[in-house]
Amino acid sequence: MPDKVTIAALQQMKRDGQKIAGVVAWDTPIAKIADLAGVDLASVGDSVGVNLWGHDDPLQVTMDEMLIVCKAVRRGTTRALVSCDLPYGPVQHSPKAAIAAAGRLMKDGGADMIKVDAAADFPDAVRALVEAGVPVFAQFGLTPQTAAKHGIPYSSQNSPNAQATAEAAEKLVEEARMLEQAGACMLDFTNSGPVAGAAVVKAVKIPVIGGFGGGPWLDGRVRLAHTAIGYADKWLDSKTDTYVNTAKAALGAFTALIADVRAGKQIKG
């Protein structure tokens, strides 16, 4: 892998059978640590609205907010390829609006690639973006914006395709091929079952990665950075396995800090 990850390098990884490792990052320190660890992809997600800002769904995240977050992650990376989500709105409005928004995220935000949520619903926008020179990371399946729009809980257990019937898998394969033909350089296969995931990977030449619900046959995985390190209050009582429980460590640190302040001791750091 070169010093700076490129789309071509990620596509070569698929051909070589090497898994792509990515994280969803929203701030400079986390992006910098993940980059130093050697992640291939830093994905700037509109999931920041739900996981960091307390919104009920990602539809409330604005273009200006995504630009700020994209800049923060870009400043934290030197090696990883940076992908940034188009927030809800531009793609739904028109291909022209999508191109303008993507241009801002690339020119001003420093994104290397633009992710389009529910891309299979907007093939004209995907084609227009590609023709305008925008590298498109096309997300399909049960995507966060689609789930929020229709009031569907966003988890693999609640996906209508989680058990991946043959009919569902066939439809998803058709969508994957359509997105590849539209010019997408990578696919984000989301929450739609391992059977369909395996079929999609075989059906297209471009990398197919996913967060959960896609099975081990995907060309790579992308994980929320804050989930990987257990960095949220929900991890205080959670028995879900993470690589480290930062929430419990932070609780202990803040408790010790408060005790030192109360006792008049010199605080650390």
What are these regions (language model features)?
Residues 2-269:
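Alpha/beta enzyme core
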